[in-house]
Structures are given as structure tokens and as C-alpha cells.
């Protein structure tokens, strides 16, 4: 792994585990699960560790999918510039990157 990949993975893990270092959004379908279920779902994403070459080919921990209380769930982390207009010029550099964690039902992808 490159140093950039290690840094990107660490920043993604920070967002996923602690909801710091970026923003988190959810789809309407996830919101419809209710606030208590969403809290449990966020906790499940925080401890998610089933990363493998099939769902994490670049080793960045930027995607995951699993079943949550009978619902197929996906999460992904995207890298934008600080104005959220374009892709980040360097996802390993938090000074130029805004991370966005999106939580969705698989059917909403």
C-alpha cells in the first residue's frame, strides 16, 4: 500500500467510526427506518470491518455493504473539493478534501 492509501484509509475510518473529518448524509429510505434504527445503523457502520478485495479493491475503506435488521444497506465515502463542487485534487490531504459518507438502502443506489 502507498502512504497516500494508508492516509486515505485512516481518514475514512475516522469519518466512519467517529463522524469527524467530513459530513454524513442518509437517503430517504434510511431516514424512514426511524431515529432509533438510524442510531443503531450508524453504530454498525462504525464497527464495520468486513473489508476485502471484492468491496475494497483499493484498500481505502470507502465502501461497505451488509444486512441491517433485514434491510440491505450500503455506505460509501466520496472525496470532494472543499466547496463540494468537484472531486478532491488529493483525497489524502484533508486541507483540500471534504469527505461525504452516504448511508443508503441498497435499492436506492
Label each residue range with its predicted role.
Residues 2-67:
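Compact soluble domain cores
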Residues 63-109:
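Short, compact, well-ordered microdomains
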Amino acid at each position: 500500500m502507498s502512504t497516500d492509501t494508508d492516509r486515505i484509509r485512516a481518514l475514512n475510518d475516522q469519518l466512519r467510526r467517529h463522524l469527524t473529518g467530513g459530513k454524513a448524509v442518509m437517503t430517504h429510505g434510511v431516514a424512514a427506518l426511524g431515529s432509533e434504527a438510524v442510531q443503531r445503523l450508524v453504530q454498525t457502520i462504525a464497527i464495520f470491518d468486513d473489508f476485502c478485495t471484492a468491496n475494497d479493491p483499493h484498500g481505502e475503506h470507502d465502501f461497505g455493504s451488509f444486512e441491517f435488521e433485514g434491510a440491505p444497506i450500503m455506505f460509501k465515502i466520496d472525496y470532494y473539493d472543499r466547496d463540494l463542487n468537484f472531486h478532491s485534487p488529493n483525497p489524502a490531504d484533508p486541507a483540500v478534501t471534504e469527505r461525504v459518507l452516504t448511508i443508503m438502502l441498497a435499492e436506492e443506489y
